[in-house]
Amino acid sequence: VKQIGDRATVMRDGATVGVFDIASVTKEELVESMIGRAVQARPPRRHNPGSGPLLHVRRAAIPGVIDIDDITVGRGEIVGLAGLGGAGRSTLLATIFGDRKADLDMTLGDEHIVSLTPRTAVGLGIGLVPEDRKRQGLFLEQSILRNAAIAALTPFRINPMARAREVCHPPLTRLGVKFASVDQPVGLLSGGNQQKVVLAKWMARGIDLLLLDEPTRGLDIGAKADLFEQVHA
């Protein structure tokens, strides 16, 4: 818009909220008008040396797919994985979550792990926000509440859905998920709000290690800022 436009009309929630002269308006002003609040494209950099090791992957190998050794994550650290598409990032995260069979040797806290399933991983305090949230992270026809509570429902033996509302309301509110009712299908939400529900699922459960695979894909700048803020929290 800044490169080819003369004027910009910004709409939000079905209404015009501003008309701007491209020569004088800043990118930040346009974004604030679109989102309804000021946002940072990137959160301020924070140095966190961690408080001791949490995860140590000594080996994670699938013949012809990945061959990884010596990855360490400290408690409180944010560790990024970089690489081109197909480099193995998603496969490694799926392996750590127990969703891919592999030659595995890793330690999580005091637990030595050589074999893992997703059920066991969740029990150990590992959560995964997958790259394809619609196919792998959500039950689109189920309610927002059921999706947010699904990882935490098992311990609720008595009146589970009432307990789910109590446990899931704080993370949904904290993440700023926009919905008419927690009983509406999660598939009706925007991509950014769907991603927040996936994240709320693990916040409701309470985990030690959160694996994020392309977490900002398909999100608008406001949803990205919200996600960055929670990851840094």
Label every model-predicted segment:
Residues 1-233:
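Glycine-rich phosphate-binding loops of nucleotide-dependent enzymes
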